[in-house]
Amino acid sequence: MNRNHHDHLDAAGKDMWSRLSDLADKADMLYEREGISKDRKSVSEEEEEKKTRFSILVDLVGRLCDQEERRTLGSSPTKTNTLFEGSEKSHLDHHLDHLPQKPRSSLECFFTRVYTRRNHNNVSTSSSLFNTDEFERTETKSPTIRNSQSSPSSCLMENTKRKRYQSSGKSKKPKFDPFSLTAARETPEWLLDVMRKMKGAEGPIKLIYEKTLTATDVKPSESRLLIPFNKLLRNDFLTPEESRAIAIDKEEEEEDTKKIGVKTIIVNQFSKEWSLRFLIWVMKKKKSGNGTLYYTLNRGWNGVVSGNKLKANDNISLWTFRCGGVLCFALEKE
């Protein structure tokens, strides 16, 4: 013969369990009372709010059960805040003070059953109503270097009005893997030291590109470093203003107009700096006439090559950071 999990309780215990049920009903009534305001919210917002409030309610009940146990053992009680105010607060406190000492996992199961039974959207309990991992997402950030007040005049950027580049009605987006092990490399200590010496240098610091240099990359007559979109480790290092400044439209592509781009700075591990231009370059194929998009560093790249003694087959890495809000690159030669 099946028995309910509270059949072993005496009359007082059953009464306490009954009051717990009343508490759940009361919580459900409060949600129904707020139905009009919730109708104005999206389904996702409504569900997130329900998850959060039910999670807090379960935690509250668990803490009050702990408080009841401490009081029974003779320990001094601790003050516990509730979710509700006014008459509803006093009514709920009356029931909460007599809750049975059930494990929190049982309380969670109980509230999940009550919530599911009354949920008009038929939300399954398998959606992990009380999974707090959904609300505790962390993000690893690069170190931020702040030695002095950032000055917009210390690092200048030239903006030009451009249209968004389009090819055959489709925009070509850079491909990158934000979760690659390469992109997760730690910031080199030398870069942090260089940034401390720069006025207005700050993070976030991002590793965006790695390459084995070709003969063309170090050829003086070319005087530029091409960075293919699909070889980027990440493409979130530009501000909206910078993206507009380096963008090109169809007319500019056909006219092969010289692009201005944005002014940028490259530094090496010896704190030496070079001023360059950063822009988008279109490499057209002779047969098809289709263009491939690249980022490019030019108008000073030869100085970077000679100053760092770069040659073909050298492995380099490019990191980005900010100087007074302006895009800067750090060149690491391996």
Curated annotation (Swiss-Prot):
It comes from the Eukaryota. PROSITE patterns: B3. Pfam families: At2g31720-like. One of its GO terms (molecular function) is DNA binding. One of its GO terms (cellular component) is nucleus. Residues 73-84, 141-157 have a biased composition (Polar residues). Residues 69-89, 133-178 are annotated as: Disordered. Residues 229-334 bind DNA. InterPro entries: At2g31720-like, B3_DNA-bd, DNA-bd_pseudobarrel_sf. It is found in: Nucleus. Residues 161-173 have a biased composition (Basic residues). Keywords: DNA-binding, Nucleus, Transcription, Transcription regulation. The keyword Transcription applies. PANTHER family: B3 DOMAIN PLANT PROTEIN-RELATED (PTHR31541), TF-B3 DOMAIN-CONTAINING PROTEIN (PTHR31541:SF34). This is Putative B3 domain-containing protein At3g49610.
